[in-house]
Amino acid sequence: MIRFSVFLFAIGVAALAPAIASAQSTPAPAAPAASPSPSPAPNPIGPAFGANDPCTSISAIVTRPSVTNSVCTVRPNHVEIETGYQNVTFDGGGNAVTYPQALIRVGLPIPALEFDVAPPQISRASAGGVTTTGSTDVGAGLKYVFGYTPKFNYGGQVFFTAPTGTNGVSAGGTTASYALNAGYTLSPVFSLAGTATAQSQTNGTQRWSALASSLVLGVALPNATGLNAEIAQFSHAIGPGTPTRTQYLLAVYRDLGPRIQLDTSFAVSPTTATGKYHYVGFGASFYF
């Protein structure tokens, strides 16, 4: 009996030996490591300055073709160039064309501050069979965003011109503009923006103060497209003591990617005392 029991024990050990060896030599498989989530791609416009920063898209930064200035500034170490063409037809006859309507905006190292330069533009006017071509005055200024909330943003800018123009296109002296800009988001589709600008104007022999004010309704449409409808007024529009001019503008813009925007516009002034006119324009803006 003892030998038979030993024999059975030996058989049992022999049968279990492979399983025991396998358990000792093969560790349990480790749980797979979680793959890290990919980091978001950097914004091509530049990083936001805060949780409610509205200035993170080209449509928020471009300031043409409306009279109303955009509140937003170009990000530090970036440059934006705006260009355009405008063709004005006057009610009593005559025509004026201006191009390339260039504005160079440079983001400075100080956050929310930019430096602006307006090179001379070509201006061609035709009236009574006579055509005159000249260049406009050069200008420069600074623009700054004062602050923002989830719905409201505001800022200001200063701009000065020097009498560098030719062939009667120049103002004939230095001019200065001091503007306050503001914007308010009504909904994901609708927004309001406005600008109030105090101006020191001249015609070379006289100097006077004027005020330009504007209000624009913005409509965000599908496919990176938007619509702007604006009313603007200009006091002492053509000289000291002259009436206020009113202008209505309708513009459509389309973003071609995050750094290019195209626009087209139509405007009309019905003010007889300052000369009725209407114009068409188009432009392009590039962010680098």
Identify the residue ranges that each predicted region occupies.
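Bacterial N-terminal signal peptides
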Residues: S5-A17
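Transmembrane beta-barrel domains of Gram-negative outer membranes and organellar outer membranes
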Residues: Q24-F288
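Sec/Tat signal peptide C-region and signal peptidase I cleavage site
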Residues: A19-A23
